[in-house]
């Protein structure tokens, strides 16, 4: 249903270090890299970070990234923390969302909330 998502960020390279680490753990790669934007994906660019233009603040703050399993959730969470992210909920079961819903939460360098989930 969603073709792509983009976040406006205050420092493109700082945010790229964070997303490079998280996406590497999920098997996702950079597909586009310009002065103003970086896009990640598997077969097509689906997740964009864009250098903030005239907006007064970075964009919307939550996206859920699909992982292949619990180990990938753990690895992405660890990688994000090592790349400047802030823990916003350690990996674990979230029964309020479903019996097998396993997720970890991070805040990226701009404070945008990133969930990594396996179901």
Residue map of PLM features:
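Extreme N-terminal starter segment of soluble prokaryotic enzymes
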Residues: 1-3
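Vicinal oxygen chelate
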Residues: 11-13, 65-110
